[in-house]
Amino acid sequence: MNAGSTGAVTIASFNVNGIKARLPRLIEWLEETRPDVACLQEIKTQDEGFPAADLAAIGYQAIWQGQKGFNGVAILARGEQPVEVQRGLPGDPEDEQSRYLEAEVFGIRVAGIYLPNGNPLGTDTYAYKLRWLERLHARAKELLALEEATIITGD
């Protein structure tokens, strides 16, 4: 483990609301706060548009699941490459929304999520949110059963 002089790992979550537009602020925040792991939501870019080189220039390695124009999640780690474990929330092979990414980093399993909004009540988006939450609950139970250091974070 390379994180922190005390062996502690600092994990943060940041809804960037568009990584291209907010990249300067994200870099500033990463340099100021220096989390060991940062989970990003709403990166709002396709995979090929993710600024991995800009983040690597300040010491962060990344994995990401992009989606054009909305959604999208990423997991960054300072000085260590996150190892992808799960891309997309299990349980619905037809769900194409980029809202769940899971990785091993610094000996911890980290899941970064961007939860569906689902407003207003009674709509298809609300029903999707409820199904998504059921799937998240099922995945959380699976992760707990592993009895490994695990964190689920996001927005």
PLM ranges: what are they?
Residues M1-A57, Q61-W64, N71-V73:
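N-terminal, active-site-proximal structural segment of metallo-dependent hydrolase catalytic domains
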Residues A8-G18, G107-N119, T153:
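Active-site-proximal beta-strand elements of phosphoester/diester hydrolases
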Residues S13-I19, G88-L89, A127-L130:
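Short, flexible loop segments at the rims of nucleotide/cofactor-binding pockets, characterized by
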Residues I19-A21, D92-D95, E134:
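Short gly/ser/thr-rich secondary-structure transition/capping motifs
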Residues I43-Q46, F50-P120:
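Structured beta-strand-rich core segments of catalytic domains in phosphoester-bond hydrolases
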Residues L115-N119, T123-A127, R131:
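Membrane-anchoring alpha-helices and their flanking helix-loop junctions
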Residues Y126-E147:
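A long, amphipathic alpha-helix that forms part
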Residues E148-D155:
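Acidic/histidine-rich, metal-coordinating catalytic segments
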